[in-house]
Amino acid sequence: MDKTKLIAVAACLALFINPGCNKDNPSDPDEKETKPTKEMFDSDYFETYVDPVTGVVSYLFRSDVFSSTTKYNTQSAYFSSKDMTDDERFCYFFISTKEQNGQMSTERSARVFDFKERKFYTFAGNSGCYPFLDPKKDILYFYVMGNKTNSGKVRDNGQFFKKDLLNAPRKTEELAKIPKAVAPSGSYMSRACSHITLTQDKRKVLLDAWVNNSFIQGLLNLYTGEWEEWSRNYTTHLTHGQMNPKRSDEALFAIDVWEDSNGETHKIVYDHDGAYGGQGTYPRMQLMKPDGTRTTISPSPDNNYATHEGWLEDGDHVYWCAGGVHIRNIRTGEYEHVYGQRATHCNISTDLKYVTFDNDHPDYYRGGRWKVCFLNRETGKTIDIITQRPAITTKDKPSQLHPDPHPHFVCNNKYIVCTSSDDEGYLRWCITPVDQLIRLTSK
């Protein structure tokens, strides 16, 4: 990153903890105090980035804190996830070595960072399933896919795990394995779930498994291994499963294209409902009940398209991108057009006052330049958090790391987290205080 864009924080902590060192006794779980911003994001672990156009201040995880000889990428969670606890104690991110000419990095894993103790904990977070960090109880849930066997033709196992970060951060508790009813012996499991999302009691995980040429949805009890199948089909790719954040009897899924084991591509088929001038409703967003019944959530009346959808915290609204940002109340059908210019991924604050989104203009390829933005809905004003994130690959050799910014609110809307990048081609976990964004868009 250009040194003119990096400003060292004035106050450094006197206490420096070796990232590989963990105390035997974790701190008191009842202690909830947080450090002032300059101490939380001290220069031992973070670099301060000031956007050269807007002046917005963000903090980037340093790429050299894990090794004295090797720099690493640090990536945030998906836009619909939380990767920081509400008490501001823990965050997690993915790490990897630098891509070379669009080739997948050779080392990939994940870390938890303890903001209070200034130390890291390693976990296996690279199995194609985004972990779940309970923001209120500071418990991390993650999944490990089984190894391929029979010359790569078989992958029929996997297991869930959890870490209690407040009380036993060095310990990993084993949870349920993928049942044979989902992945029979000798089958090939491409995916167990896209994101770990849990029922209200945090005992069951929603699966949107892809096994051989079948797509299976349902709930797996993490503690007993009991499997409750909701639906199974062999034609429609249901992915990005997300439990309703307020109830355990419905989930949001997305229909996407897929390629079967014979190499045939299956495109999205519009609903045969005569809507949108006879074209039929674009069925990207699907609401599913435990009996397997599905209902299409209609996109904008003026734009029959949707992508990158998610739940609002109330469990009654979903949001999505389609050029801009959109919201629909799934109970009443009421629709709202939130933002009209380009947005690729978005996330909305719990009070619905603020929106963060990213924009892949002008490159439109994975690993290209991006901008990350903030919208104050009360004033209608926007500001760039990152006016232009540098490209990390070229268009002819796109990134394999899914390096999109994926901005999202954390800590009860206090911060926005995303994945940024630097001029050396490294990805950087980035956190931005929201209060300055509100102030800058209130003038």
Short names for language-model regions:
Residues 35-41, 96-105, 145-156, 203, ...:
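Short, conserved, GDST-rich strand-edge loop motifs in beta-rich repeat architectures
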Residues 401-443:
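Blade-level signature of beta-propeller repeat domains, shared across WD40, Kelch, NHL, RCC1
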Residues 68-80, 95-147:
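Blade-loop segments of beta-propeller domains
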Residues 321-326, 330-383:
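Loop/turn-rich, solvent-exposed surfaces of beta-rich toroidal or solenoidal domains
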Residues 302, 338-349, 380-409:
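Conserved blade-ending motifs and adjacent loop-strand segments that build the rim/top face
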Residues 76, 80-90, 95, 130-146, ...:
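Blade-terminus and WD-like Trp-Asp/Gly-His loop motifs, strongest in beta-propeller folds
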Residues 123-213, 227-236:
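Asp-box/WD-like beta-propeller blade repeats and closely related beta-sheet repeat scaffolds
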Residues 33-60:
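Blade/loop signatures of beta-propeller domains
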